[in-house]
Every structure is written in structure tokens, then in C-alpha cells.
Amino acid sequence: MGKLNNTKEAQLEQNLIDLLCAQHGQWTFRSDLKTEEDLWNNLRNIIEIRNKSELNDNMLTDSEFKRIRSEILANTKTPFEAAKWLRGEKGKCSVVLERDNGLGRIELIIYSSIEKNGGFSSYEIVHQIAKNKSNLEERSRRFDITLLIGGLPIIQIELKTAIAKDGVKQAYYQIEKYIDEGTFSNTIFQTLQLYVMSNEQTTRYMAAAPKGELQDKFMFGWRTRDNTRVENINEFAKQVLNIPRAHELVSEYMILSEEVSSKILMVLHPYQIHAIEAIFEAASKHQSGYIWHATGSGKTITSFVSTKLLAQKSGIDRTIMLLDRKDLDNQTTSEFTKFASAYSTGVNTNKNTLIVGTGNTKELSNALKQDSSSNVVIVTTRQKLNKAVEYLQEKEPGRLANLRGKHIVFIVDECHRAISAQNMDDIKKVFPKSTWFGFTGTPIFEENKKSSDGQYARTTHDQYGEVLHRYTIKNALEDGSVLGFQVEHEYTIHQDEL
């Protein structure tokens, strides 16, 4: 092991700020912003610039901004609530404001998830923001580095030196202390979505969490697309904290898991992100392929997020996630709808709808023929899809003929169990412009290919095309993203008989 760098924290922080600002001028360091009140005033200025036409040259009064400030705090009590609110309607978060002096009611955009490296999005860095204690029990705090998107604190970076006790865990404990003390609560820092922790040599990231729910097992290290580990904070910053990557990470690759008893903000592993982006690239070229990810590494979540995000991409008319019939029965509708809080889940809605399963053939066929701009996501089985297609062939052949010319993307979880090569060929005849992406932990290669069945594909490559991303069991064990093996040697012949 080489000699560890003893760079003091202050210099480490300054080096990181300089690096972020040097990346094509994407981030701007705001040395003039020193306190929370400075951040609120900066946000007010950004809101006024963004909404200049709506304000009609009548800038916000103090009382108007006080109401906006109160609404932001009311909607961001937890990181989950903040994430849900920031996503807003079609990626834009807004507030409705009744203007003073009888100027009427207007809607102001506060934050955008879709204006990445463009539009009115701004990217600013603040350093050592002071949080003064509000009572005798509290302690005054200063936060290392905070990244503002659209004026709101979104990413908090906590740095320790390479010689710090417990390494990167020391930075984690600092974040944990902030949360336990309520340091972020009732402040503009309630909008934080992501924590980055580093001791310079080791860097981890994780989704923001409320008091009592932060767990170090959800700290993830970064890997490149070819699975090279990225540990150093400077290399991590180049790859993950650049624009638009940082904005994409918090807007597209964070998941809202919502159940009656639990509301959790989650962030994807790097291998999940790389797989999704590889699918995007292939789909844009109408090329199929498959993802080889280790069993137990979260393929179903990856495939679902792929399906959801593809539905929002231009050039794609419909996305359908296919599962094995037993998997859909076992996982049930709620397993998917808990990750789709931004969607309606009723089969009778026409826009922004998640449809899971549905035993009603007519309902599924109606979903298939929705307009491509409707952002409908379908999760179903090959058997139910076949019945829906048969229904359209019999009842609405004209509608089915229209679908033949559409770019339909199929995401297939456990791609050899969910659909056979023959079934897939049959569906391709109905949807000739479709592209297919399979997920598997156990690809079929030439050496273990299926027995001959006429002209049908016998390997994963033959059925789906090139492998688009790999994350093997070796990688997964290194990261701790799957459980290790317990090996026990059992003898079939008693030792005395050998």
C-alpha cells in the first residue's frame, strides 16, 4: 500500500471544489453564500429569474416569498417527501401563489428534474455553510460541501482525510450525527437527496434518509461500465458529480418505495445505472441485447426502472415488461406499484399509468393501443399478452395493424423463463419493429445451449443479441450486493471405507 495522503480537510475540500468548477464550467462556486439565510435569498433570486414572465416584472414581496418558503418546508419533511415533491408534475415542481396587492394567482416553477444542463437549471457549490444553534441544546454546525441544483441543496458531501480514524465511516458518522441532531430539519437542507462520503481514498454515496433510518449497508461504491472500481474522491467527482450525471443520478436513478408502513428513498447501484443506459443507447438504434447481472443483485428493479424510463423517451411508442407467470403471481401488483408512486395504477386511466398483470384481456388490449405520449407502463406475462393480441386480432384488427408500425420495447425479466425463443418469434411477427432486452443471471452459451428445436434460438446471444452489460457474481461478492456462499463438504462414502 502506498503512503496515504495527509492532506488537511480544508485543502481536500478546496481541491474538490476547484475540480468540480474546472469541468467545463458546469459548477459555479458561490463564495458569497455563507449562511442558510443566504441560501434562501439565492433561491428567491433564482425563482424570480426562472419565472420572470409569470411575475410580469412584479418581483416577489417578502410576504410572498415567506409563503413559498413555508410551502417548501411543509413538503420536504423527510427525504422521501422531498423527492416526491421535487418530481412534481411531469418533472417540474411548482407552487401556486396568491399574489399580494390583488395581482391574482400564478403558478411558479421551483425546481426541474428534466432541464438537465439546460433551460433554467443552475448548478452551484457552497462551502462551510454555517448552521447556528436555535436553542441551548443544539450545537452550531458547518457543512463541508453542498451542491445546489436550481438553488436547492440536493447533494451533501462530507470529507475526511485519508488518515481519519475508521476511514470513510468517519464521514458517514458525521452525516448520521447531523440527522440525529436534527441539523437538516426545518431548514432549506430538507431538500437533500444524496449523501457523498469520502476519506479521499475511499468514496461512497447513498440516498438521504430521516432519523433512525440511515444504514451503512446502503452506502455504495462506484464502478465504471466495465466494472472498474472508482474509489478516489477526485475520480468519483469526475465520473459521478459532473453535469449532467449528478442531475441525472438524483432525478432518474433514485426510487421512491412507498408502502402503507414504509416510505423510503433509494438510489440505484452503478451497475444498474450502466445497464439502463446501455439499454437506452441500444433502443435508440433499434438494437436488441441482454443484461447479464448476478442472481440476487436486483435485476427486477433494474428491469422495471428501465421500462419506466424508456416510456418517457422519444422514439419509443410503448414499453412492456414481461415476467414469468409464477414471478408475477408471487410478487403481486403491490411489489411493483410501491416503486411507482408517480403513476396512476387504475386500468381505466389514460395518462401516466402503471398497469400490472390484469386478468382482463380487454383492459390489457386497451393499454396496448394507448397513444405513445400517454406514458403508460405495462407489466405483464407472455400468456396475458398473447390473449390481448388475439383479442385485438378478432375485435379491432385496424388497431392492431397500427401497432405493427410502432416501436415497442420489451424488457424481459429472467429472460429464458419468461418467454421461449419460439414465443418471442411469434410476438415479433405481430410487432415487427419491436426491440427486446433480456435480463438474466445465467446466460446460455454455446457450451450449454438448449437442445435443437428447429430454427429457434438456442443461446442467449441468438435470442436477444449482444450482451450490453455484465455484473458477475465475482463483482457482486466484492461489493457485498449479494450474499456469499457457505460451502460444506459432505462425503457420500464413510471415511473408514475410503
Residue ranges and their predicted role:
Residues T332, A388-Q393, C415-D425, K449:
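Conserved ATPase-coupling elements of RecA-like P-loop NTPase cores
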Residues A294-T295, E414-R417, V430-K449, G480:
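Conserved helicase ATPase motor motifs in RecA-like P-loop NTPase domains
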Residues T358-I378, N402:
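Conserved motor-coupling elements within RecA-like helicase/translocase cores
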Residues I149, S284-Q287, Q370-S374, E390-I408:
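Short basic/glycine-enriched coil/helix segment immediately N-terminal to the Walker B
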Residues N232, K449-L498:
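Interdomain helical connector at the RecA1-RecA2 junction of SF1/SF2 helicase-like NTPases
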Residues R399-F437:
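SF2 helicase catalytic motif II
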Residues G2-R318, D327-Y343, S372-S373, Q383, ...:
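ATP-dependent helicase/translocase motor core
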Residues Y195-S198, I378-T381, F410, T435-T440:
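Structural recognition of the conserved hydrophobic beta-strand(s) that form the central parallel beta-sheet
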